[in-house]
A protein has these predicted regions:
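Extended, charged amphipathic alpha-helical segments
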Residues: 234-324
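Extended, helix-rich architectural segments
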Residues: 1-169
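A short linear-motif detector with a strong N-terminal bias
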Residues: 121-125, 171-174, 273-276
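Extended, regular secondary-structure scaffolds
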Residues: 136-257
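Charged, low-complexity, helix-prone segments enriched in Lys/Glu/Asp/Gln
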Residues: 18-35, 84-90, 128-138, 215-218, ...
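Tryptophan-centered short beta-strand motifs
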Residues: 57, 66, 224, 235-237, ...
């Protein structure tokens, strides 16, 4: 039986694309921190040599990863590469254009508080919209959940305020929406399942740790239910219908945000070109770096002490007649 923590195959397939896009948006520091994930090493960096005494031959051994000497060479190779933050700058500019003017926002008085505190975390409705717009450029899908605790029939506005029962709008990124499904109910296709991976903090003294939990939204016999599981898949909160003013809902109040082609971010092509330039710059800058030094060539030399080569090096002559 599939565990609640097991993601949908489609989610797993496109997750690397989203991670790649996020790194490009974050910029050079994040890209370089990922190392070989975005900048493959040269073949020579994964090779070492050994000497075959029996045949008098030097053997080149290919390793699965960087060798000790290769690690030092790769560090230099990566440092010389340049990643220009074209993707991040483009998204910042486009989102800036979208929100260059204040939107007209007309809300009923009972939910007017959403303008200043849309998600119960102090984020304004405008700020939440900007986050959702930014995410729409990065990932093929994200979503908004209209979250509201169950409220009994006849609950007053004072009850809602005093018991933290206000509705709120929560934004979930691609990585958090691990599973979903649709069903045809009364000749209409409806969202029948959403599994959301959430992170909560647990404080033990002064130590704060993050733990995963899984919120399940589903239609059972046409009624909206919620349940909660911990990171090991154990049930934490029983499956219960969500009651609003004493009434049950027949739909899941979760709304997908999907822009562009199916399962493709609108920024994918720009991201791919951004990484292509990054990898080309690594080769080009590395070539320039090593070819910029003098190449010494010596003939007629006899076996003797090795000499250090490079800038900042002085060769000393043991002769008393030496000059420099």
């Amino acid at each position: 039986m599939t565990q609640v923590t097991e993601p949908r195959e489609e989610y797993t397939h496109y997750l690397p694309d989203v991670e790649r896009n996020r790194a490009a948006v974050a910029g050079e520091r994040e890209v370089k921190r990922a190392g070989v994930k975005f900048l493959p090493p040269l073949a020579s960096m994964c090779c070492d040599t050994s000497y075959d005494d029996q045949n008098g031959m030097t053997i080149i051994n290919q390793q699965s990863g960087l060798t000790l000497e290769g690690q030092a060479a790769y560090t230099k190779y990566k440092a010389l590469a340049s990643f220009y933050g074209a993707t991040g700058r483009t998204i910042d500019g486009l989102v800036g254009l979208i929100f260059s003017k204040e939107a007209v926002c007309e809300l009923p008085a009972i939910v007017d508080y959403l303008k200043e505190n849309a998600d119960s975390k102090g984020n304004t409705l405008r700020s939440l919209a900007k986050k959702a717009s930014t995410e729409a450029f990065i990932a093929p899908r994200s979503g908004l959940l209209v979250a509201r605790p169950s409220t009994p029939q006849g609950a007053s506005q004072l009850d809602v305020e005093m018991n933290n029962l206000r509705p709120k709008i929560l934004h979930y990124k691609y990585e958090s929406i691990i599973n979903w499904d649709y069903e045809v109910i009364n000749n209409v296709e409806k969202l029948s399942l959403v599994i959301l991976k959430e992170q909560v903090t647990k404080r033990r003294g002064f130590k704060v740790e993050c733990e995963d939990q899984y919120r399940v939204l589903e239609l059972i016999d046409g009624v909206y239910h919620q349940s909660l599981y911990n990171d090991s898949g154990a049930l934490v909160e029983e499956v219960m219908p969500v009651i609003i003013n004493g009434n049950m809902s027949d739909e899941i109040p979760f709304y997908f945000i999907e822009v562009g082609a199916e399962n493709k971010s609108v920024m994918n092509d720009l991201v791919d070109m951004n990484f292509h330039h990054y990898q080309v710059s690594a080769d080009y800058n590395s070539k320039n770096h090593f070819s910029s030094f003098i190449i010494w060539y010596e003939t007629g030399a006899q076996q003797g002490q090795n000499m250090l080569m490079g800038n900042g090096v002085k060769w000393s002559n043991v002769s008393s007649d030496a000059t420099f």
